[in-house]
Design a protein with these regions (language model features):
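TPR-repeat structural position
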Residues: 41, 75-76, 122
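Bacterial Sec-dependent N-terminal signal peptides
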Residues: 1-25
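Structural motif corresponding to the intra-repeat A-B loop/turn of tetratricopeptide repeats
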Residues: 38, 72-73, 119
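Short, conserved micro-motifs composed of acidic
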Residues: 26-27, 58, 97-107, 111, ...
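Alpha-helical segment of the N-proximal tetratricopeptide repeat
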Residues: 23-50, 54
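Residue-level recognition of tetratricopeptide repeat
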Residues: 33, 67-68, 114
């Protein structure tokens, strides 16, 4: 009888334990959702994975894991496994934010297509994007189908560009510059003796500076205390002397451009630029031109052509303020987003990132030549492998565009993203080759010259 009573008690306890386990799991889920909504994917990912390990393995959780992995450099190839599982159970009436939801939304199919594209599986990406369009069916008004079609075209463009790669040489700036985290937004002074960049550390985003001596970069100095940042300031450009820095400040509801000056070997507390640069909307990037008489910046203010547009403002020396900005026009700006403009040393070429021009996927880097006052040539895709099937957002040109600095993930790198210097070889910048010994110039004359 005692044994029978013990068994009944054990069964009752097990029934009570299950609702408690589910309640605990729901709390983990809500925490993960919170981090994901604030785009803190590295915080959200282990929580979603915990749910899988605890037995809550369903299409919904697999979808969220795949989504997170697609946003973390170095882990994007792992997203395919989870998104493939997610699309096996699509729920067209998907309940966003519900732990009880076991299915995945139709949008999971789009994410699978994106995962194939990012991982250069272009045939599978095209097939999956078409499947997504079929799944959407008559509900096209609920989805941005223009963007889906643009992704399809970008896969086709990627095929073309990957068949004809440009000639480059890539130099990783090394472990002294690159931390184990994401090292991004590299900007340099004209002679490349000073670099400033942002590193996304574990607890905050920090701005660093390094000086080059004897052709070697020194230990980076954390500028965050000098510029009095709470992790919300990000460098965007340097002037040619490297003693004035523009920064982007991320506020809860908008972004603003600030400026800091180097005085007595220290950077001043940044001050906000005037109302002609900063609006109540998002200003996300700004750069100086060579003579520092103009600032090119991005903004999604009213009256633009697309999302973020590129504008230019000229300094009014009489009134000592930046003048009213001019939109660079439809030759540069598209109905999508343009970002991170930089001007070449001679002031004749603009480099920028765009979602709207003919690219390989997401943002690509383009350049256009100045052909008149606020007039530009048709933008040219800088080419593969500088551009990839992923987002490529930041290219700081040096040597009039024959080289540049950018951040990217590399399998043999030091961090999630490393800062690299890329030399671009062309007719205007031919690759030089050093040889030792002798080479034969003419088979008939048998003339030999010493190698160099």
């Amino acid at each position: 009888m005692k044994k029978f009573a013990f068994l009944i008690t054990a069964v009752i306890l097990s029934f009570n334990a299950f609702p408690q386990a589910e309640k605990n799991a729901e709390e983990v889920f809500l925490d993960a959702e919170y981090y994901r909504l604030y785009e803190e994917y590295e915080e959200a990912l282990p929580l979603y994975q915990q749910l899988i390990n605890e037995g809550f393995d369903n299409a919904h959780i697999n979808y969220r894991i795949g989504e997170c992995l697609l946003e973390i450099p170095g882990k994007k190839d792992n997203s395919l496994v989870y998104l493939k599982k997610a699309v096996d159970n699509i729920n067209k009436k998907f309940k966003e934010g519900s732990f009880k939801e076991k299915g995945a939304p139709v949008y999971a199919v789009f994410y699978l297509g994106k995962a194939y594209q990012v991982n250069e599986k272009l045939d599978k990406a095209l097939e999956t994007y078409e499947t997504f369009k079929e799944k959407v069916g008559d509900n096209k008004d609920n989805y941005n189908m223009d963007f889906v079609n643009k992704q399809i075209e970008s896969c086709k463009t990627a095929r073309e560009l990957m068949k004809n790669p440009i000639n480059i040489e890539e130099e990783n700036l090394g472990q002294i510059i690159n931390s184990p985290y994401q090292n991004i937004k590299p900007v340099v002074k004209n002679d490349e003796s000073r670099i400033i960049f942002t590193s996304k550390l574990k607890f905050y985003d920090a701005v660093f500076m390094s000086e080059k001596k004897d052709n070697k970069w020194g230990p980076p100095q954390n500028l965050t205390p000098q510029i009095k940042s709470d992790g919300d300031l990000y460098n965007t450009s340097l002037n040619k002397e490297g003693n004035e820095m523009l920064l982007f400040k991320a506020n809860p509801y908008n972004g603003e451009i600030y400026k800091s000056t180097r005085e007595d070997n220290k950077w001043t507390e940044p001050h906000k630029l005037g109302k002609n640069i900063n609006s109540k909307y998002w200003e996300t990037h700004a750069c100086f031109c060579e003579d520092e008489n103009k600032i090119y910046f991005t903004s999604n203010r009213r009256g633009g052509i697309g999302g973020l547009d590129i504008y230019v403002s000229t300094y009014d020396r009489k009134n000592q303020e930046w003048g009213k900005p001019k939109n660079l026009g439809r030759q540069i700006n598209t109905p999508y987003n343009e970002e991170t403009p930089f001007i070449s040393k001679d002031g004749k070429r603009i480099y920028f990132s765009s979602q709207g021009h003919k690219g390989m996927g997401g943002f690509d880097i383009f350049y256009a030549d100045k052909i008149g006052e606020n007039k530009w040539s048709k933008p040219v895709n800088i080419g593969y492998p500088i551009n990839t099937t992923d987002d490529d957002l930041f290219f700081c040109p040096v040597d009039n565009g024959n080289a540049g600095y950018m951040a990217k993930y590399t399998k043999d790198g030091y961090g999630q993203k490393d800062i690299v210097r890329i030399e671009i070889f062309s007719k205007n910048n031919p690759r030089t080759i050093s040889l030792e010994g002798s080479i034969k110039l003419d088979e008939h004359k048998k003339k030999m010259i010493p190698g160099k």
